[in-house]
Amino acid sequence: MATKPQDANTTSREAITSKADSPPRPTALIFDSGVGGLSVYQEIRQLLPNLHYIYAFDNVAFPYGEKSGEFIVERVLEIVTAVQQSHPLAIVVIACNTASTVSLPALRERFAFPVVGVVPAIKPAVRLTRNGVVGLLATRATVHASYTLDLIARFATDCKIELLGSSELVEAAETKLHGGVVPLEVLKKILHPWLSMREPPDTIVLGCTHFPLLTEELAQVLPEGTRMVDSGAAIARRTAWLISSQENVISSQDENIAYCMALDEDTDALLPVLQSYGFPKLQKLPI
């Protein structure tokens, strides 16, 4: 049974807005296991700058790429439910490829609001490749997911798809966003299977939302002219369409906020980064 947005304690700060009132400010939850979802959030905010944004990340169970599908589904349901109990959500974006490949059906069954997922951009990469070799760079869970293999079977029959799963690259992206430096030698080691090929992929699918955060570093390691493709812009367009198609939404006056699952020294260090993205507060989500 779908869960409806909570409204019992929000009437003083939020109101049902009709088209005759001022432009509504519906609430969008962007969720990822870590900070990679900020790359998707940036794309969405460019199209929809006036939404009320919530960013939630699971720093307790991060990274998801090594977790079982059952664990991920239960965890994502728990987190989205906890956010929904405090905020009237208009839409949820699961900005995590690994979580999207396993949790979307369960989320859509439980909640009434639309849920958007992130999937590897196989189809556009196939259109862009010049040498017919496309690389999919993702977590191990995404690389081996049946959904990913189905995308390849449907859209890449005329191409050679080279799969490379790496949780180390996810950690590198987290390091960069926390202010650290990612040594190029680390990336070269991760990408060695491709770099050692006689004809490496000329188009790379960034199949994890963390990886667009490393495009500058990846460009220095990959062969010159290699194209990198992600699904952030497509997810933003889908989100904008779903928001615009809603007749009545609950408009929030709250500030943007970020939630983590535990507060520690790492989250303290991350707060200035989140503030630079437009999230002035970081709180522990009560789950």
UniProtKB/Swiss-Prot annotation:
It comes from the Bacteria. Its EC number is 5.1.1.3. Transmembrane segments: none annotated. Residues 1-15 have a biased composition (Polar residues). One of its GO terms (biological process) is peptidoglycan biosynthetic process. One of its GO terms (molecular function) is glutamate racemase activity. Belongs to the aspartate/glutamate racemases family. Gene3D superfamilies: 3.40.50.1860. The gene is murI. It is an enzyme of class 5 (isomerase). PANTHER family: GLUTAMATE RACEMASE (PTHR21198:SF2). Pfam families: Asp_Glu_race. Provides the (R)-glutamate required for cell wall biosynthesis. Substrate binds at residues 32-33, 64-65, 97-98, 209-210. Pathway: Cell wall biogenesis; peptidoglycan biosynthesis. The keyword Isomerase applies. It catalyses: L-glutamate = D-glutamate. This is Glutamate racemase. Keywords: Cell shape, Cell wall biogenesis/degradation, Isomerase, Peptidoglycan synthesis. The active site is at residues 96, 208. Residues 1-25 are annotated as: Disordered. The keyword Amino-acid biosynthesis does not apply.
